[in-house]
């Protein structure tokens, strides 16, 4: 469903109340990765250039409904000032709502930016309390949601406030929806998805929804072990979910009945311990000995998956192929990242480890769309409606 965007508003003299995702990693008060701040810059710049005063709000970390000094947004304000020299002023406040926030918002002039304090310091945020939503709405004239990464949460700053102001999408939100919904609703075929990660139980809804849409589904990571177990293979000491075996069998049957290629590893990298310096070897999935565990996909599987990916026209990848955090077992994930970069079609990567692999290998510019939202992109892949998106005005 198409939503209004910041292009649909005359911003001259208006205050834009913008929900961004500035949930950045901090170490000793220093930002270690400012990707999420940079991702919001196109929206902020557009608003400033079109005569708006810009009020930004975000959560940071999990302060559990109280003020936590180490989770204040002051480091974000400082970084934003470095990244946005064209702003007439960039101000911070230790208030999110109430008289101090209202006074700061009233004083804000076109071309200036105000960063409100961490929304999750207020217990009403995660409860989606109407009183907080109304107080936030007092601060601006139009609400902009550019926080796709929080769009699956119905909080006061992501969903509640949209009931009390005109509500539109920012550029990041627009790009995420266009890429993911476009791929799911109108893909150029062949349409392939690669799903990895540790557990089937986390991705049942995603796989079920995709089985009605894709031409091929490639499975890796720990979840592949449970599918292999469902097919009768001995999995040694591998991570498996015995309770999910019936679900795995059901998904395999559904794929077969719908003519979807459901690809599982044919060879794997096994180790005798969960450790980077463990003994390891490559075996066929039928030859996993007792006491050994699967920690990555093998080279034969990499070749088969690579061929499917590089000949596809639409590919979505979410989740690692192995224990990506241990270097000897990161090869499968890295190989899939390379295959994605070599695919000429529409390529979309989401999920922390998948994105990290692409970025570590310097391949980010070869991927058409890198999703900023882990949980939000998974819920879209499940076919769910995201509260933060549903709350925006229809185009």
Swiss-Prot record:
Q: Name one Pfam family in it.
A: PGK
Question: Does this UniProt record's set of keywords contain S-adenosyl-L-methionine?
Answer: no
Q: Gene3D superfamilies of this UniProt entry?
A: Phosphoglycerate kinase, N-terminal domain
Keywords, sorted A to Z: ATP-binding, Cytoplasm, Glycolysis, Kinase, Nucleotide-binding, Transferase
Q: Which GO terms describe its molecular function?
A: ADP binding; ATP binding; phosphoglycerate kinase activity
Q: Which reaction does it catalyse?
A: (2R)-3-phosphoglycerate + ATP = (2R)-3-phospho-glyceroyl phosphate + ADP
List the GO cellular component terms: cytosol
Q: Which domain of life is it from?
A: Bacteria
Q: InterPro entries attached here?
A: Phosphoglycerate_kinase, Phosphoglycerate_kinase_N, Phosphoglycerate_kinase_sf
Q: Where does substrate bind?
A: 21-23, 36, 59-62, 120, 153
Task: Tell me where in or outside the cell this protein is found.
Answer: Cytoplasm
The residues the record assigns to binding ATP are 203, 325, 351-354
**Would you indicate the residue range of the signal peptide?**
none
User: What Enzyme Commission number(s) does the record list for this chain?
Assistant: 2.7.2.3
Family designation: Belongs to the phosphoglycerate kinase family.
Oligomeric state and interaction partners are given as: Monomer.
This chain belongs to which protein, by name?
Phosphoglycerate kinase
Q: Which organism is it from?
A: Roseiflexus sp. (strain RS-1)
């Amino acid at each position: 469903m198409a939503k209004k965007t910041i292009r649909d508003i005359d911003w001259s003299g208006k205050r834009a109340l913008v929900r961004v995702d500035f949930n950045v990693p901090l170490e000793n008060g220093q930002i270690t990765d400012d990707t999420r701040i940079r991702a919001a810059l196109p929206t902020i710049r557009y608003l400033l250039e079109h005569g708006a005063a810009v009020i930004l709000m975000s959560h940071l970390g999990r302060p559990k409904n109280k003020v936590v000094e180490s989770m204040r947004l002051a480091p974000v304000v400082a970084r934003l000032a470095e990244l946005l020299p064209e702003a007439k002023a960039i101000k911070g406040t230790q208030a999110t709502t109430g008289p101090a926030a209202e006074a700061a918002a009233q004083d804000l002039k076109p071309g200036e930016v105000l960063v409100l304090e961490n929304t999750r310091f207020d217990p009403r945020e995660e409860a989606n309390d109407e009183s907080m939503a109304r107080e936030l709405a007092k601060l601006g004239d139009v609400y902009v949601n550019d926080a796709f990464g929080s769009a699956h949460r119905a909080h006061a700053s992501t969903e509640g406030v949209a009931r009390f102001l005109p509500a539109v999408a920012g550029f990041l939100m627009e790009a995420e929806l266009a890429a993911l919904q476009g791929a799911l609703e109108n893909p150029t075929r062949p349409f392939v998805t690669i799903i990895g990660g540790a557990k089937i139980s986390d991705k049942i809804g995603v796989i079920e929804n995709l089985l009605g849409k894709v031409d091929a589904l490639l499975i890796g990571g720990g979840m592949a072990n449970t599918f292999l177990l469902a097919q009768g293979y001995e999995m040694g000491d591998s991570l498996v979910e015995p309770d999910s075996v019936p679900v795995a069998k059901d998904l395999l049957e559904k794929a077969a009945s719908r003519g979807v290629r459901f690809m599982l590893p044919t060879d794997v990298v096994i180790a005798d311990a969960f450790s980077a310096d463990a003994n390891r070897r490559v075996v066929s999935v039928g030859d996993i000995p007792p006491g050994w565990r699967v920690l990555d996909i093998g080279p034969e599987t990499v070749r088969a998956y690579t061929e499917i990916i590089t000949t596809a026209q639409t590919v979505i990848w979410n989740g690692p192929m192995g224990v990506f955090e241990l270097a000897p077992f990161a090869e499968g994930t890295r190989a899939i990242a390379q295959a994605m970069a070599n695919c000429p079609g529409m390529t979309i990567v989401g999920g922390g480890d998948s994105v990290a692999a692409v970025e570590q290998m310097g391949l980010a510019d070869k991927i058409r769309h890198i999703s900023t939202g882990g949980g939000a992109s998974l819920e879209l892949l499940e076919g769910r409606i995201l509260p933060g998106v549903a709350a925006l005005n229809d185009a």
